[in-house]
Amino acid sequence: MNSDKAQHILVTAPLGFGGITSMMINIQKNLDRDKLNFDYLVLHDRHEDLEDIVLGMGSKKIVASADDVRNKFLRGITRWYRLYRTFKDNNIKVLHLNGGPSSDMNIVFLAKLAGVKHVTFHTHNAGSAVYRNKISVIMSNAYKPLMPAFVDSFWACSSLAAQFSFPKKIVVNQVYKFIPNGIALEKYAFDLTIREKVRRDLGVENKFVIGHAGRFN
């Protein structure tokens, strides 16, 4: 595979364990990566759990960190500037923003200012703790009406997520694409043979078992 000849889309997703990143990696694994591939924009300059996987698929990790700035206000300003320089210096043409509340539009504004031609806003959130912050509430309400002027494609994981993040006219006119979360369902289909073998291997054949699928972190 020669990923250097592929068209690359810059994706905003942390490279630690998480639902959004897992979805993007599942999609990436099923792409013809000779033609289309993802690069990943991250906001912290550190090694993350899944970055070796995406680097192995021909992706680049692009860092726009402001962690070196101690003052909270200056850190925010610095992050905006470094995001702008990241888009500009890397000649980014297509951005896939994995977001939730419309306050994430800050990144869209910076991308467009830096010359990004196409921005997809992909919402995965039908409600967020961000609404505990009054400033974020004000920003989200102010930004929503501006979204159609700056966002080229609207994607949502559900109708509720679309209602949460997008302007009413985008939702009412269904000017968004419904993208189900990327899960390979066949991997999780019930199999009686596997069930019996695993229970036998664990010595719990005739016992009541409570399982946890997830991470304790």
Can you say where each PLM-predicted feature lies in the sequence?
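Conserved donor-binding/catalytic core segment of Leloir-type glycosyltransferases
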Residues: 7-10, 204-217
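N-terminal strand-loop element at the rim of the active site
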Residues: 10-18, 28-75
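Histidine-centered beta-alpha loop that forms part of the nucleotide-sugar donor binding/catalytic region
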Residues: 13-14, 66, 98-100, 123-126, ...
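A short, charged, and often flexible helix/loop element on the N-terminal side
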Residues: 58-82, 94-97, 128-135
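Nucleotide-sugar donor phosphate/pyrophosphate-binding loop at the beta->alpha transition
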Residues: 74-81, 118-121, 127-150, 163-170, ...
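An aromatic- and histidine-rich active-site surface loop
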Residues: 94-116, 123, 127
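A short, active-site helix/loop in glycosyltransferases that binds the activated sugar's phosphate group
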Residues: 149-189
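A short helix/loop element that forms part of the nucleotide-sugar donor recognition site in Leloir-type
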Residues: 189-204
